[in-house]
Amino acid sequence: MKAKYIVIAMLFLAVGSMAFAVDVDGVLKDGEYSKEAVFDKGNYRLYWEFQDDKVFMAIVAKTPGWVAIGFEPSTVMANSDMIFGLVGEPGNVQAVDAWSSGMFGPHPPDVNQGGASSILSFAGTRTGDMVVFEFSRLLNTGDKFDKVIPVSGNFKVIWAYGPNLQFTAKHSKAGSAVLKMEGGN
């Protein structure tokens, strides 16, 4: 009888811990992400969570176009590892793993430069001009066009969103920040 209660308790703990796991489905749920940074007066929000050797991120932005996040640029956009989310009609979601070679671009996809797309999963939803884009990737992909994402300390990011769903369209709004990877900016 005692063993039965132990099994039930273990199942309860397992199910309870799964409820807090990130589900890359393009929908944010309460408690899904424990870290958040807010930019552009709330028009761009970045959420992130670490699980094992992976990072899960969500971008929520008010835009008719694409959304993007860049990691550890050297100057402006130069040498930045970037992820673009293009969220169109239901079922039409694209993710681009890119690398910016210059201060103001260009930022072609990693696969066009001899690298790999390191995005493990992605999803997005759009309601009017509100976009939710989620993705996951390894903290250290080993790709020469990807930056290692730390789980603690400061980490410089650049963020942007575009006027339409053309990956090459110039951003409507952009900025940079230093994140405290334990949570916040």
Model-predicted segments: where are they?
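C-terminal segment of classical bacterial N-terminal signal peptides
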Residues: L13-A21
